[in-house]
């Protein structure tokens, strides 16, 4: 999800998103090198007027252009596999958040606390304040402590949705009758925006997600005040 006047990925707010950005840059460098090499060879052959009548095969060059792509794929596959295992690893979460997708809003439950659950609707344009973002702000934000491991359980009640926060590197499908889970670690305070990333009906574009990251002390105060 791009932001205003920005062609790059969003600034990361978690270690996993940093690793995703590093992998993206790593792969992009390899692709640029391949593009330059292939482009140079094609242009050279296009302007080359020499003909060799007797060169029917070249085992060495065939061996080279078979091995080089394999080595290139290894350089892409190894960091990718490492990142996949990191994204699936779940280590002693402090808090479990349950997210339930509906047409067209989200419900949240803090499973570790009693009676902390709420619905989160997009703020309509006619009710927006001057500091709200159009189609992104909600009436009830998710409040989470930074510098702690968070587990999120995602499901849906009607159709398939997808719970996504780009700056945290999180995208989890919400399937009816199924509970998916992932984890993330927010390493700085702030407000982070996301949206449903699976087409789920007429108002698919109007079910944003907002996370407010605060210190653990302020989070405890928020829990006490909410209770």
Curated annotation (Swiss-Prot):
Parts of the chain on the Mitochondrial matrix side: 52-62
Domain of life: Eukaryota
E.C. no: 7.1.1.9
Main location: mitochondrion
Molecular function terms from GO: copper ion binding; cytochrome-c oxidase activity
Residues at which Cu cation A1 binds: 161, 196, 200, 207
Disulfide pattern: none
Residue intervals on the Mitochondrial intermembrane side: 1-26, 82-227
Binding site for Cu cation A2: 196, 198, 200, 204
Cofactor mode of binding and number, as noted: Binds a dinuclear copper A center per subunit.
GO BP terms in the entry: ATP synthesis coupled electron transport
The keyword Nucleus appears for this protein: no
Localisation per UniProt entry: Mitochondrion inner membrane
Cofactor requirement: Cu cation
Chain residues that bind Mg(2+): 198
One GO cellular component term noted in the UniProt record for this chain: mitochondrial inner membrane
SUBUNIT field: Component of the cytochrome c oxidase (complex IV, CIV), a multisubunit enzyme composed of a catalytic core of 3 subunits and several supernumerary subunits. The complex exists as a monomer or a dimer and forms supercomplexes (SCs) in the inner mitochondrial membrane with ubiquinol-cytochrome c oxidoreductase (cytochrome b-c1 complex, complex III, CIII).
NCBIfam families associated with the record: CoxB
Name of the featured protein: Cytochrome c oxidase subunit 2
Source species of the chain: Choristoneura rosaceana (Oblique banded leafroller)
Encoding gene per record: COII
């Amino acid at each position: 999800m791009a932001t205003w006047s920005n062609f790059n990925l969003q600034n990361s707010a978690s270690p996993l998103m940093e690793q995703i950005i590093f992998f993206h840059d790593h792969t992009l460098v390899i692709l640029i090198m391949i593009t330059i090499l292939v482009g140079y060879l094609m242009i050279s052959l296009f302007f080359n007027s020499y003909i060799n009548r007797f060169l029917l095969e070249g085992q060495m060059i065939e061996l080279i252009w078979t091995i080089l792509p394999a080595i290139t794929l290894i350089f892409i596959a190894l960091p990718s596999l490492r990142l996949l295992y990191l994204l699936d690893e779940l280590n002693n979460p402090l808090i479990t958040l349950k997210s339930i997708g509906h047409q067209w809003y989200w419900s949240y439950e803090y499973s570790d606390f009693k009676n902390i659950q709420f619905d989160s609707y997009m703020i309509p344009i006619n009710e927006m304040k001057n500091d709200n973002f159009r189609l992104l702000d909600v009436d009830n934000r998710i409040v989470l402590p930074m510098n702690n491991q968070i587990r999120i359980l995602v499901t849906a009640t009607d159709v398939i949705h997808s719970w996504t926060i780009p700056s945290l590197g999180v995208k989890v499908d919400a399937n009816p009758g199924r509970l998916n889970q992932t984890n993330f670690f927010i390493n700085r305070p702030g407000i982070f925006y996301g949206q449903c990333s699976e087409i789920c009906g007429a108002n698919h574009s109007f079910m944003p997600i907002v996370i407010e990251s605060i210190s653990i002390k302020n989070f405890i105060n928020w829990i006490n005040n909410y209770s």
